[in-house]
Amino acid sequence: MGLRTPLFDEHVALKARLVDFGGWDMPVQYASVLDEHHAVRRDKGMFDVSHMTLLELTGPDAVSYLQRLLANDVARLLLPGKALYSVMLNERGGVIDDLIVYAPTPEQPDLWRVIVNCGTHDKDLAWMQAQAASFRVALIERTDLAMVAVQGPESRAAVHAVLSEHV
């Protein structure tokens, strides 16, 4: 038995076929793989990505910290809640890992979110925490939250039907 996302019981109730993915019990399919593939390519589909590491970053040096840590420029995140794909660099400019940074929203103007791969969790967090020591920032891992990726050409409409604003 592996690690479980907050949505694990829902996957079981929906009769998902579960597999080990990096130590996590994750759904690989519910019905036909081909039908699910076509649904996402032609319409929409949802994926539990809660096994990925969700970090919240706050503090007066949050932007400076991210600028030091990443190859990409977080100043490019001009709209609230927008995401930026980047790589995290070591002290010599080599790539440690890739990740996604989300800009703060009007509701939480000082809160940045960073999504890190689950397979490199320990290494990435150790590096991020070591770098944070030189900045006035706080890194908080949020294992209590679920993350769902909604993908496909009709994904925006589906999300808008559930969430009323700023999507």
Task: Report the location of each language-model feature.
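Basic, glycine/lysine-rich polyanion-binding surfaces/domains
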Residues: 1-167
